[in-house]
């Protein structure tokens, strides 16, 4: 029986069940290029479906990668009818929350007690903006919003959402949120069970059912936790380069993901030289680096023999703009052949 795993992402690109795809790894290894490439290939392979690519990295790069401006609202990629992008902007989201709090304060008759004046100055946004993990929390809220929209038939509907995540530490905090919130809400539930009437009276004229709101939030968080741990719905694609530190961090990331019960079976290895196949450009430095890369590639192949390990070439130019991304991303669907495809890495269009 042949247990060989294909060295490409063909099965994921053509998947009809996945709703959430996370792309992550160490900083500077090509996560954004990889997430854009996965999103493009899925959109090209399944033209009847809609895909959304979300950047949860504070150093948003989607706009730079595609060469067009994206913001906090999803917008179609020029030249692709079924792929949209958005960049979650924590500062803009916090300002929106601040404005909402001002409106609520005025509605509840608190406009004259100074609270509205404080909030008008952006105090809530300033305070919450300094809380560690706020970026991850806002990204999580975006996931909750999309699930709610899908269930209620509201807003734009997307068959699959691809996440261009922040470097490893931020991503792990984001993925911990469902479990953390679930435990936190359980504790809150115990408190509200004992102090419910008093808490509801403190809610004021708004007559907010705090216990009901907490239960609703807990149900939504549990739905996300269940979806994130369902391998048919969610998977994580690790991105690395063939160097010691990147390999070490990838292993740590994979072990953490396994502890969260998340599916992870794909690794993209970027920036490979394939020096012995390129006699025309094979300098001593290239030979030395390729020798080092092969050493760690051998370790990757040994450690992750049951993973889809996709080996991507180092291109001569920048992989920016839709046309260049299409050329590069094709090697996710059908693995790069350094002999047959060697010329492609020198044929990228220059971008200003």
From Swiss-Prot:
Belongs to the arsA ATPase family. Homodimer. Component of the Golgi to ER traffic (GET) complex, which is composed of GET1, GET2 and GET3. Within the complex, GET1 and GET2 form a heterotetramer which is stabilized by phosphatidylinositol binding and which binds to the GET3 homodimer. Interacts with the chloride channel protein GEF1. It is found in: Cytoplasm; Endoplasmic reticulum; Golgi apparatus. Gene3D superfamilies: P-loop containing nucleotide triphosphate hydrolases. The active site is at 57. GO terms for biological process: cellular response to oxidative stress; pheromone-dependent signal transduction involved in conjugation with cellular fusion; post-translational protein targeting to endoplasmic reticulum membrane; response to heat; response to metal ion; retrograde vesicle-mediated transport, Golgi to endoplasmic reticulum; tail-anchored membrane protein insertion into ER membrane. ATPase required for the post-translational delivery of tail-anchored (TA) proteins to the endoplasmic reticulum. Recognizes and selectively binds the transmembrane domain of TA proteins in the cytosol. This complex then targets to the endoplasmic reticulum by membrane-bound receptors GET1 and GET2, where the tail-anchored protein is released for insertion. This process is regulated by ATP binding and hydrolysis. ATP binding drives the homodimer towards the closed dimer state, facilitating recognition of newly synthesized TA membrane proteins. ATP hydrolysis is required for insertion. GO terms for cellular component: GET complex; Golgi apparatus. Keywords: ATP-binding, Cytoplasm, Endoplasmic reticulum, Golgi apparatus, Hydrolase, Metal-binding, Nucleotide-binding, Transport, Zinc. ATP binds at residues 26-33, 243, 270. Zn(2+) binds at residues 283, 286. GO terms for molecular function: ATP binding; ATP hydrolysis activity; guanyl-nucleotide exchange factor activity; identical protein binding; metal ion binding; protein folding chaperone; unfolded protein binding. The lineage of its organism: Eukaryota, Fungi, Dikarya, Ascomycota, Saccharomycotina. Its EC number is 3.6.-.-. This is ATPase GET3.
């Amino acid at each position: 029986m042949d247990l060989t795993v294909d060295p490409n992402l063909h099965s994921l690109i053509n998947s009809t069940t996945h709703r959430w795809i996370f792309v992550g790894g160490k900083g500077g290894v090509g996560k954004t290029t990889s997430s854009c490439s996965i999103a493009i290939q899925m959109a090209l392979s399944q033209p009847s479906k809609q895909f959304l690519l979300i950047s949860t990295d504070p150093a948003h790069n989607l706009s730079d990668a595609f060469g067009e401006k994206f913001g906090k609202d999803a917008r179609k990629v020029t030249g692709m009818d079924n792929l949209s992008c958005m960049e979650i902007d924590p500062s803009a989201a916090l300002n929106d929350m601040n404005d909402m709090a001002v409106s609520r304060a005025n509605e509840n008759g608190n406009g004259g007690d100074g609270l509205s004046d404080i909030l008008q100055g952006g105090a809530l946004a300033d305070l919450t903006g300094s809380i560690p993990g706020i970026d991850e929390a806002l990204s999580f809220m975006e996931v909750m919003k999309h699930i709610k929209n899908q269930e209620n038939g509201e807003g734009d509907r997307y068959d699959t959402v691809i996440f261009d995540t922040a470097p490893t530490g931020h991503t792990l905090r984001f993925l911990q949120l469902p479990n953390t919130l679930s435990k936190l809400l359980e504790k809150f539930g115990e408190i509200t069970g004992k102090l419910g009437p008093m808490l509801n009276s403190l809610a004021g004229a708004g007559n907010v059912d705090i216990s009901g709101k907490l239960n609703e939030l807990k149900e939504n968080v549990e739905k996300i936790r269940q979806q994130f741990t369902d391998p048919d719905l969610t998977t994580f694609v690790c991105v690395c380069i063939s160097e010691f530190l990147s390999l070490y961090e990838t292993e740590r990331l994979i072990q953490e993901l396994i502890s969260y019960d998340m599916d992870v079976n794909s690794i993209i290895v970027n920036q490979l030289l394939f020096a012995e196949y390129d006699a025309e450009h094979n300098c001593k430095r290239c030979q030395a680096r390729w020798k080092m890369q092969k050493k760690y590639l051998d370790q990757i192949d040994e450690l992750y023999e049951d993973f889809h390990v996709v080996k991507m070439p180092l291109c001569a130019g920048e992989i920016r703009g839709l046309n260049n991304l299409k050329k590069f991303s094709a090697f996710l669907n059908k693995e790069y052949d350094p002999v047959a495809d060697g010329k492609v890495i020198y044929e990228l269009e220059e971008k200003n």
